[in-house]
């Protein structure tokens, strides 16, 4: 009997839940990216949803770009999100790193023009084994371009240029002057802090 009551209580609890529609941030088009159930709108707040750039743009070539959005506001049945981070799928990264190539990684903590603090992880794959001095030169190029972009762009524009490959393309353009490249990528972004809003 106790087991039946537990099952019945679980069913009743599920019946009380409502579905909330989750929307991407405005600068990603504000499109619907998922549904989530909850018996209280407060429980929807801070939930994180993972989607791919393909889900948002319809571009099948962007399925390896994972985006993370966090719910910050609920109005009625609608849940609105903010960008929390991105990363490339591990399988995609593995496909780039082959024998006799060199992977150069850079991790940079930046502050955007409008005060958002981000950790940006960039990656360059050289077509062959390269010298340590060449690695250092390429890493310096990565740093200079990412820092310059942070100074010039607000949070939304920086994220879009990173996610859409524009920053990586600029890194590749300069880094290939040091050594022929296979690929340059922004492989991960994490939001570390947001600007304080004046009371």
UniProtKB/Swiss-Prot annotation:
PROSITE patterns named in the record: RIBOSOMAL_S3AE (PS01191)
GO CC terms: ribonucleoprotein complex; ribosome
ATP-binding in keyword set: no
UniProt KW Ribosomal protein keyword: yes
Molecular function, one GO term: structural constituent of ribosome
Assigned keywords, A-Z: Ribonucleoprotein, Ribosomal protein
GO BP, one annotated term: translation
Pfam families per the UniProt record, alphabetical: Ribosomal_S3Ae
Family matches, as HAMAP family: Ribosomal_eS1
Annotated PANTHER family: 40S RIBOSOMAL PROTEIN S3A
Protein family per UniProt: Belongs to the eukaryotic ribosomal protein eS1 family.
Protein name per Swiss-Prot or TrEMBL: Small ribosomal subunit protein eS1
Lineage of origin: Archaea, Methanobacteriati, Methanobacteriota, Thermococci, Thermococcales
């Amino acid at each position: 009997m106790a087991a039946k009551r537990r099952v019945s209580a679980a069913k009743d609890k599920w019946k009380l839940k409502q579905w909330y529609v989750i929307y991407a941030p405005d600068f990603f088009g504000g499109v619907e990216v998922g549904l989530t159930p909850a018996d209280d709108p407060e429980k929807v707040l801070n939930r994180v949803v993972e989607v791919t750039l393909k889900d948002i743009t319809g571009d099948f070539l962007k399925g390896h770009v994972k985006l993370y959005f966090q719910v910050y506001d609920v109005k009625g049945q609608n849940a609105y999100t903010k960008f929390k981070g991105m990363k490339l799928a591990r399988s995609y990264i593995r496909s780039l790193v082959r024998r006799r190539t060199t992977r150069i990684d850079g991790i940079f903590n930046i502050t955007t023009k409008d005060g958002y603090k981000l950790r940006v992880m960039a990656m360059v794959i050289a077509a062959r084994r390269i010298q340590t001095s060449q690695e250092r030169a390429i890493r310096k190029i990565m740093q200079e371009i990412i820092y310059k972009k942070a100074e010039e762009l607000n949070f939304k524009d920086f994220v879009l240029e990173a996610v859409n490959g524009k920053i990586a393309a600029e890194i590749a353009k300069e880094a290939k002057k040091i050594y022929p490249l296979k690929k340059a990528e922004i492989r991960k972004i994490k939001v570390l802090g947001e600007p304080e809003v004046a009371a």
